[in-house]
Design a protein with these regions (language model features):
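Juxtamembrane intracellular "pre-TM" segments in multi-pass secondary transporters
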Residues: 1-9, 188-216, 400
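Helix-loop boundary and gating motifs at the non-cytosolic
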Residues: 9-52, 56, 214-216, 224-237, ...
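Helix-to-loop junctions at the C-terminal end of transmembrane segments
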Residues: 62-74, 160, 262-274
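Cytoplasmic helix-loop-helix junction between adjacent transmembrane helices
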Residues: 109-144
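Intracellular juxtamembrane helix-capping segments at the cytosolic ends
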Residues: 115-129, 316-331
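C-terminal membrane-cytosol helix-exit motif in multi-pass small-molecule transporters
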Residues: 174-194, 384-389
């Protein structure tokens, strides 16, 4: 039994350590960049939202080309190349102060993140450790993602308070490159005799994507809209209310701990209950938790339960949306790449819409008002698109 556990650990650890490092570095940077833009670059709220939003724009722009380019044989090279670009962007941030230069670095980071993570997720589904099922692989993947977010907030905020933003950015620059190398070594090259998927036109490949993939994209979009406005503007509002960077980082980490723990435990939960029944309550819970943040912004303790609820909502929604999408496409190598691209694309659109819309509304009415109103707007948009899509999917599922 111990030998079996050791074998499982050797198979799972490097792969999910890679996922952990990528997310930990990116999440820590996302917490610190708005503060850096405000304190060092002296940008206004609308400008901060626009610069941060460039990251999502660049990431989104690369998704579909990377998804179409992806194959099992190219995946490892894409992973390492993307990690190198993100590492370069992280390390250069504290060396520049101009708005244009910082915007370019956000774009470079978004490009690297897009290339690396699209390949990473597709490789994981194509060759999961020990042949694990998609649900198990996605549960561990989402759990490692949440764990990376959890550690990032504490480490990033504490290190920035102790050593300064400049040193912290240099340290974080190592995370995407080390993560890429860890997975590159553990996955290994594609088998020489592996069959190639049939080649179809790009437009046809997109049209043939199952409806479950598009529903998953909507889920990803919604959770990242809420997450991005919180990450971008809650630190600025909390600093003005008297919280320290360490406290802000701890709150971010609490949300991520709740998210990661729910993801690791999602397998047994969804084996007994229908995941679809949890979707609407989780969407509403995440919306309300975000809306109540400004009402208790001056209290570190009072914000803890709100961040816990937001983390639980995000974590469980991330697992269900991803697993359903990949189960729908089966073992098609091309569709693995495209599904990964589309799901991450939903997250990327959320990263764009959240900071930009948040910056515009906050610039006009203040951050507190924005955090109370904008989550409901995202909820209404999600309902308008997701409910008809799920209704259309039921007859298709019944015919299969």
């Amino acid at each position: 039994m111990s030998g079996s556990r050791a074998r499982a650990f050797r198979a799972f650890a490097p792969v999910y350590f890679s996922v952990f490092l990528f997310v930990a570095g990116s999440s820590a940077v996302s917490v610190l960049v708005p503060v850096y833009l405000s304190r060092q670059a002296h940008l206004g709220l609308a400008a901060i939202g626009a610069v941060v939003g460039v990251y999502g724009i660049a990431s989104l722009a690369a998704r579909i080309p990377v998804g179409l380019l992806y194959s099992a044989g190219r995946g490892r090279g894409l992973l390492v190349g993307g990690g190198l670009l993100s590492a370069l962007a992280f390390g250069l941030v504290p060396l520049v102060h101009g708005t244009l230069a910082l915007t370019v670095l956000m774009a470079l980071n978004g490009l690297g993140w897009s290339i690396a993570t699209t390949a990473q997720l597709a490789l994981l589904v194509a060759r999961p450790p020990l042949g694990a099922s998609t649900a198990v692989a996605m549960g561990w993947f989402s759990g490692a993602t949440g764990l990376g977010n959890a550690v990032a907030g504490i480490v990033g905020g504490s290190l920035a308070d102790a050593a300064g933003l400049r040193v912290t950015f240099f340290v974080l620059a190592a995370t995407p490159l080390v993560g890429a190398i860890a997975m590159w070594r553990s996955i290994g090259a594609a088998p020489a005799g592996a069959p190639m998927p049939p080649r179809v036109g790009r437009r046809l490949a997109v049209v043939r994507m199952p409806l479950a993939v598009w529903v998953g994209v909507l889920v990803m979009f919604f959770i990242n809209c809420l997450n991005s406005i919180t990450n971008t503007f809650q630190p600025v509002l909390a600093l003005g209310a008297g919280l320290s960077l360490t406290q802000i980082g701890v709150l971010s980490s609490i949300r991520s701990w709740a998210s990661s723990s729910s993801r690791f435990g999602s397998g047994p939960l969804f084996a007994r209950f229908d995941p679809a029944g949890f979707t609407m309550p989780l969407v509403v819970a995440g919306t309300l938790a975000t809306c109540f943040i400004p009402s208790v912004i001056g209290s570190f303790v009072a914000q803890i339960p709100l961040f816990v609820i937001a983390g639980l909502s995000r974590g469980l929604l991330r697992v269900t949306g991803t697993a359903d999408a990949f189960d729908a496409v089966g073992q098609n190598d091309r569709q693995h790449g495209l599904t990964s691209a589309f799901l991450y694309g939903g997250l990327d659109v959320g990263k764009i819409v959240g900071p930009v819309a948040g910056g515009v509304v906050a610039g006009a009415f203040g951050i507190a008002t924005m955090l109370r109103v904008l989550p409901f707007a995202f909820l209404l948009l999600y309902l308008a698109l997701a409910v008809p899509a799920r209704r259309a999917a039921r007859p298709v599922a019944g015919m299969s």
